[in-house]
A protein has these predicted regions:
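Histidine/lysine/aspartate-rich catalytic loop segments that bind and position anionic ligands
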Residues: 118-164, 170-171
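Intrinsically disordered, low-complexity regions enriched in acidic/Ser/Thr/Pro/Gln residues
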Residues: 1-135, 141-142
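Structural signal for hydrophobic packing residues in well-ordered secondary-structure cores
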Residues: 38-39, 87, 119, 159, ...
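Feature captures the catalytic cores and cofactor-binding loops of soluble hydro-lyases/lyases
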Residues: 148-225, 234
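A charged, well-structured terminal subsegment
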Residues: 229-237
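Short beta-strand-to-turn element immediately C-terminal to the catalytic PLP-Schiff-base lysine
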Residues: 133-134, 226-228
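Glycine-centered flexibility sites
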Residues: 33, 39, 84, 126-127, ...
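Short, glycine- and charge-enriched coil/turn segments that flank and shape catalytic ligand pockets
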Residues: 42-44, 56, 162-165, 235-236
Length: 237
């Protein structure tokens, strides 16, 4: 099976914001999640309209966005490097996540297994990443995409569209947890991020002050916890 890829152009208020190589599905979720995870909107109530072209190559969004936030986004985008085609890699001074949520390691490891079980396209092709959102006992959202950033954006967007509060969720990912993914979680207000892969030093550095729990190599019945262990019931707050 050959994976279908498209270049989707996200247009905000008549101006191109970003172009992303992605799977041509759940693009409404992707757009909403991207805007939230880049700090441009607080939630779906800021969006007046959102439409996807029939060929899945153009996503048109009309939304109330603070001009200063848009300027800051474009400055970050100009500085960003690597495969994170968003602007998150240049993040500094992230806000502390306002959440009292915590999770048990057993629940998170169980949900990682659920995410892997749901990853049908990966099993068929071996060419996509998966991401999911959980409240602990339940897997609430799931997405696959060519890029780990896109998959995370789709999950965040789906939760926003379903009015699921992000402050009570953990994001799970099959991809490396780097600074750009961590900053997406922070700007969206997600308190816990768990990866099946590695966590980078800059992600750990940014997660500590933001009070985000980060964990990597979550496989079988083990994980490495790097920051905010209280959110996994492993320390006092």
């Amino acid at each position: 099976m050959v994976i279908e890829e498209t270049i989707a152009e996200l247009v905000l208020n008549g101006r191109t914001l970003v172009r992303a190589g992605c799977l041509p599905d759940s693009l409404e979720d992707f757009a909403l999640g991207f805007l939230a995870s880049e700090g441009l909107i607080a939630g779906p109530e800021a969006v007046a309209s959102l439409s996807v072209s029939p060929d899945s190559r153009r996503i048109e969004v009309r939304a109330a966005v603070d001009p200063d936030l848009l300027v800051a986004f474009r400055e970050r985008l100009a500085l960003s490097t690597g495969c994170g085609r968003g602007a998150s890699a240049a993040a500094e001074n992230l806000p502390q996540v306002a959440s009292d949520a915590w999770f048990t390691p057993d629940d998170l490891l169980d949900r990682m297994k659920d995410m892997d079980a749901a990853a049908a396209l990966f099993r068929e092709t071996g060419g996509v990443h998966a991401a999911a959102a959980t409240d602990g006992p339940t897997l609430l959202a799931f997405a696959e995409d060519l890029g780990r950033h896109n998959a995370v954006d789709k999950v965040i967007g789906r939760c926003l569209r379903q009015k699921i509060p992000l402050a009570g969720l953990a994001i799970l990912s099959t991809g490396r947890l780097s600074a750009d993914v961590l900053t997406k979680a922070a700007r969206a207000g997600v308190p816990v991020v768990v990866s099946r892969g590695a966590v980078t030093s800059l992600a750990i550095q940014l997660a500590g002050p933001a009070d985000i729990a980060t964990a990597g190599f979550a496989r079988a019945r083990k994980m490495n916890v790097y920051t905010a262990p209280w959110r996994l019931g492993l320390a006092e707050r």
